[in-house]
């Protein structure tokens, strides 16, 4: 009986030819480029343009030191990857937000149909500031090959309340001050978080934005989903028509539940949000939410993962859901904090059960 490897399943799902090299890419192992080096593109995404796949991600220094920027790898078959170098570089200019020594995470690139530009959004932390900045960076390029030009960095939706906050909700949020709660995870503190304490705190300067992804809907509208409010609550932010800014329209998802690493897909009219808990570099069980509208309400479901190590998302953390037609791949990283550049990649097909609920089953 003919035995198919995991990656042959991926290739068949995406209508790609099988090759003799298919067994080189089992999930969670070393995936090499044309130079025999592990693909150093983490927390990013893949887009398909013409006959080429473009894989963007965090380029983590292989020898220690500052991050060089965002890397790009290309492939014709999703098996053989070519290192194209750095397409968004950190710079020496100390007045620039992306000066060397900053932290760039979770870069995502999408094509904007309204401008025909390729837009990159990424989580940015300023040099020497730890994770206090919690900003979004914007860059763009006329070509998927780059290079990308850095445009600006900011916190989203300054001066704007969530769309569903009525006057009474704003009053409740303003009634809480973080300095009045010395201890986290008390019932009163949790209530204050749910009622928007951190939204009110950050209203003037903009909301925090850390782990993030981009989702482009069927109508061409784009949304940025990010961990906000001290990583306690997800925000879904509508992007402007050129994808280079925020309209100010946003909602909160799962207030106080501590989600990060958001990924999003839409299948048969339902939006599915697959996330991670907040446990640093250590893996944890994936979470899942659904809604009939991007604006919610969102309902929580059990983890979509099945098989060995499902309780730790196969020892990984999601970074993107790559879609081609109605086929989806869940992309994840197995973080290696002592050498992040060597963190293995996990790509697994997403299937749907009889009720249309996503399932991610381990295959090797």
Regions of interest found by a model, annotated:
Residues 1-21:
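Bacterial Sec-dependent N-terminal signal peptides
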Residues 20-364:
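Carbohydrate-active catalytic/glycan-binding domains of CAZyme proteins
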């Amino acid at each position: 009986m003919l035995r198919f490897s995991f990656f042959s399943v991926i290739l068949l799902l995406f209508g790609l030819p099988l090759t003799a090299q298919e067994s080189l890419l089992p999930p969670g192992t070393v995936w090499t480029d044309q130079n025999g080096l592990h693909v150093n593109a983490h927390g990013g995404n893949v887009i398909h343009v013409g006959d080429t796949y473009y894989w963007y991600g965090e380029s983590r220094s292989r020898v220690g030191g500052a991050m060089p920027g965002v890397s790009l790898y290309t492939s014709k078959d999703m098996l053989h990857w070519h290192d194209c170098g750095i397409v968004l570089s950190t710079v020496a200019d100390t007045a620039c937000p992306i000066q060397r020594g900053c932290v760039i995470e979770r870069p995502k690139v999408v094509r904007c149909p309204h401008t025909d530009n390729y837009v990159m959004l990424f989580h940015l932390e300023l040099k020497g500031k730890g994770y206090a900045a919690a900003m979004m960076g914007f860059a763009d390029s006329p070509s998927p090959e780059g290079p990308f030009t850095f445009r600006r960095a900011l916190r989203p939706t300054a001066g704007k309340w969530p769309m569903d906050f009525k006057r009474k909700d704003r009053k409740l949020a303003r009634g809480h001050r973080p300095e009045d709660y010395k201890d986290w995870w008390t019932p009163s503190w949790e209530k204050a978080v749910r009622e928007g304490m951190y939204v009110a705190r950050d209203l003037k300067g903009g909301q925090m934005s850390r782990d993030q992804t981009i989702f482009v809907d069927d109508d061409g509208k784009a949304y940025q989903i990010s961990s906000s409010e001290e990583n306690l609550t997800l925000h879904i932010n509508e992007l402007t028509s050129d994808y280079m800014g925020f309209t100010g329209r946003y909602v909160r998802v799962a207030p106080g539940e501590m989600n990060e690493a958001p990924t999003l897909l839409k299948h048969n009219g339902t939006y599915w949000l697959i996330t991670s808990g907040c446990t640093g570099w250590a893996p944890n069980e994936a979470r899942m939410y659904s809604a009939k509208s991007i604006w919610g309400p969102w309902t929580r479901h059990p983890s979509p993962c099945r098989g060995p190590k499902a309780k730790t998302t196969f020892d990984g953390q999601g970074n993107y859901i790559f879609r081609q037609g109605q086929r989806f791949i869940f992309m994840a990283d197995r973080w290696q904090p002592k050498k992040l550049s060597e963190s293995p990649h996990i790509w697994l097909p997403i299937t749907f059960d009889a009720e249309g609920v996503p399932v991610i089953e381990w295959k090797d």
